[in-house]
A protein has these predicted regions:
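Buried hydrophobic positions in well-ordered alpha/beta secondary-structure cores of metabolic enzymes
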Residues: 8, 45, 82, 95, ...
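Gly/Ser/Thr-enriched, mixed-charge loops and adjacent short helices
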Residues: 13, 107-232
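Short glycine-rich phosphate-binding loop at a beta-alpha junction
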Residues: 40-48, 72, 176-178, 279-285, ...
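Phosphate-binding and adjacent anionic-ligand microenvironments
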Residues: 236, 273-450
Length: 450
């Protein structure tokens, strides 16, 4: 049986794969496991703007309250806001209903511990055991006054906005910022932060209707933002994903600045301030080779993990690093928050611009992207981890690994959140890489479709 939890919580198509029944059982199990040593635990619950969010919230909260826990609802806020607010309100755990960058039919449920960190695999496994096997036989379901109660926290948005603003001492007067809020969880807080810091703000994709989240907008579709920054003559643009834990930036020329480039410029900024602990950045095996080259040139070490911001965070916590992330835009700044926070990252990027008195193009220019080609093979979700067991696929991978051995690299991996196998090649010839990536991806699709 496939593991219920992926790299970013439980995710699936809402109302079928992620049903209300499953959400209810996740509520019960998480409240029991995450706060088993507390008499009446408190679980903070937030969500993004998806239509299915309120439905799943009701089911999750019912499960939480059914085991005697208290649910505190903060409604629509970014995922990193829940991590912070769980700590601020001293809750025993936090829960977020969101499918991040995925399209509207998907939703997900992920959890934070009382310190605002994503759960380790072992804790997720304990929750999954209860979801699939039921509550422990010695657990007595509460009745009467022992049943839990949901309450709404009205000032959570204000508290998170103030927290983000407190991460900088820089004013943004005279700067023009363009925001793409992905019709998602940042639609209210992002413009508040930048306006209150003094910037002129042009905000787009900030009118969610429950069905338009990530719809040709946000960090996975930044093309329009690039055009807008050029058309408006703005200083910088920022695109968030549906739950605002990712960020893509756009410089004053309308050029996209991805997560690797953001990490490179922030690494140098932190090093200059004496704040880059152990002079090290944590990235993943999918990071561009240009990041390695740039960091080596400036005397900064780089550690690599498997793909997934949870694994980046684990490495950072284990070895005491403060900066890490992924090319996709998850950037973790442990001096400020316990998870990737797109809004805080954006504030740090623009703060670095102000302090250095340089445009973003100059700061991000510290790293030159190596040519890279990527393609996602759409496969049966139950078969996506079997690509390295299929003889035809293994043979093609071996052939390409040999081809790129001395001039680049090949990475093939199953997505932790979608029914896809991701293929990436780095090398000197873009057209040749595009052909090879496409050929391997189509072979994987043919072999691993249902």
């Amino acid at each position: 049986m496939a593991r219920l939890f992926g790299t970013d919580g439980v995710r699936g198509i809402a109302n079928t794969e992620l049903s209300c029944e499953l959400a209810f059982r996740l509520g019960q199990a998480s409240a029991y496991v995450l706060a088993s040593d507390v008499h009446r635990p408190t679980i903070l619950v937030g969500r993004d703007t998806r239509l299915s969010g309120e439905m799943l919230e009701s089911a999750l909260v019912a499960g939480i309250c059914s085991v005697g826990a208290r649910a505190v609802l903060v409604e629509v806020l970014p995922t990193p806001a829940i991590a912070y607010l769980t700590r601020f309100y001293e809750a025993d755990a936090g829960a977020v209903i969101s499918a991040s960058h995925n399209t509207v039919e998907y939703n997900g449920i992920k959890f934070f511990d009382k310190n605002g960190y994503k759960l380790p695999d072992a804790i997720e496994d304990r929750i999954e055991e209860i979801v699939t096997g039921g509550m422990p036989t010695d657990f007595e379901m509460p009745i009467g006054e022992r049943v839990g109660r949901p309450v709404r926290q009205r000032n959570a948005t204000r508290r998170y906005v103030d927290f983000v603003k407190e991460t900088t001492n820089v004013r943004l007067d005279g700067l023009h910022v363009v925001l793409d809020c992905a019709q998602g969880a940042s639609y209210e807080v992002a413009p508040m932060v930048f306006k209150e810091l003094g910037a002129k703000v042009s905000c787009y994709y900030h009118e969610p209707d429950g069905t338009n989240i990530n719809d040709n907008c946000g960090s996975t579709h930044p093309r329009r933002l690039c055009e807008l920054v050029r058309e408006l003559g703005a200083d910088v643009g920022f695109a968030f994903d549906g739950d605002a834990d990712r960020l893509m930036a756009v410089d004053e020329r309308g050029q996209l600045i991805n997560g690797d480039q953001v990490m490179a410029m922030l690494a140098l900024h932190l090093k200059e301030q004496g704040r880059l602990r152990q002079n090290t950045v944590v990235a993943t095996v999918m990071s561009n080779m240009g990041l390695d080259i740039a960091m080596k040139k400036h005397g900064i070490k780089i550690e690599k993990t498997r793909v997934g911001d949870r694994y980046v965070l684990e490495k950072m916590l284990a070895d005491g690093y403060v900066l890490g992330g992924e090319q996709s835009g998850h950037v973790i700044l442990l001096d400020y928050n316990t998870t990737g926070d797109g809004l805080i990252t954006a504030v740090q990027v623009i703060s670095a611009m102000v302090q250095a008195q340089r445009p973003l193009s100059r700061l991000a220019g510290v790293m030159q992207m190596m040519p890279q080609s990527q393609y996602d093979a759409n496969v049966d979700d139950k078969k996506k981890y079997d690509f390295d067991k299929n003889e035809k696929i293994k043979q093609k991978i071996a052939e390409l690994e040999l081809k790129y051995k001395d001039k680049g690299r090949l990475v093939v991996r199953a997505s932790g959140t979608e029914p896809r196998v991701r293929v990436m090649i780095e090398g000197p010839d873009q057209r040749e890489m595009d052909r090879d990536v496409y050929a391997l991806s189509k072979l994987i699709e043919h072999e691993l479709r249902g």
